[in-house]
A protein has these predicted regions:
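Bacterial N-terminal signal peptides
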Residues: 5-15
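Amphipathic alpha-helical interaction segments
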Residues: 11, 18, 73, 211, ...
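Contiguous, structured surface segment used for ligand recognition
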Residues: 20-159
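Feature activates predominantly on carbohydrate-active enzymes
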Residues: 96-239
């Protein structure tokens, strides 16, 4: 019994000595924020949740986020412009860099601070990642728990250019898929889409002033010996 008590006490002290990174190892945010300070309890989204924002630009960011709950949860948090009290409050902090944000989540409210709409948008994408995966669904998830853990997050981009290239010149994809890719880019805080529209395989963009670009250039015809040397056993025919 004595040894069991000692082991229990040692375990408790070891847990207290763990750094915050280990205490929040179950929290997955991509990319990893600059700092995360865990809190106590959870904030729960419901039909009574409301946003208070300072202007219409912030309101548009909040409405796009609220729309996720419309399909997945069956309720839509309302957005109020100019109000001072709300469950989720947007506050402009000019001391923060562009795209940076501070996020304070408590069981009673969420305070979002940023210097521009990009920062407010990325803060909500962090909350989006903290919510259950059901938030990405198109049908109401009856049993989902729309809670996020209490914490304080400070984040700013390490790189100004964070890009993804999509090669639509050689690999065709439906428009709906491309729009979904753009949505996922925003969630992962990737800020630049590089559309690879034209390649040697073919010209894909219709320009009415230059119809031959698509009539001829849209297809590539192999012409042996015209672009590369033709290797024949015993000798090499050069261009």
């Amino acid at each position: 019994m004595k040894y069991a008590c000692l082991i229990l006490l040692w375990s408790l002290f070891a847990t207290m000595a763990l750094p915050a990174d280990n205490l929040i190892q179950s929290i997955s945010i991509v990319p990893c924020p600059e700092s995360i300070t865990p809190g106590t309890g959870y904030f729960t989204f419901s039909g009574k949740t409301d946003f208070t924002v300072e202007n219409e630009e912030q309101a548009e960011v909040a409405r796009c986020f609220s729309a996720l709950f419309t399909q997945a949860a069956g309720f839509t948090p309302c957005v109020k412009v100019g109000e001072k009290k709300g469950k989720i409050s947007f506050l402009t902090d000019d001391a923060l860099k562009s795209e940076a944000y501070h996020l304070e989540i408590t069981p009673r409210q969420i305070i979002v601070k940023a210097s521009d709409t990009k920062g407010f948008f990325y803060a909500l994408q962090t909350i989006r990642q903290l919510l259950p995966a059901s938030i990405e669904g198109t049908a109401v998830a009856e049993t989902a728990d729309w809670s996020v853990p209490a914490m304080t997050i400070k984040d700013e981009p390490r790189f100004g250019y964070r890009g993804l290239m999509v090669d639509v010149a050689r690999f065709f994809i439906p428009k709906e898929n491309l729009l979904r890719i753009i949505d996922c880019m925003g969630m992962l805080k990737i800020n630049t889409l590089h559309l690879h529209l034209v390649d040697d395989n073919g010209w894909r963009i219709e320009i009415k002033r230059y119809p031959l670009l698509t009539e001829i250039g849209s297809r590539r015809v192999d012409r042996p010996g015209k672009s590369f040397p033709v290797v024949i056993p015993g000798r090499v025919n050069r261009l």
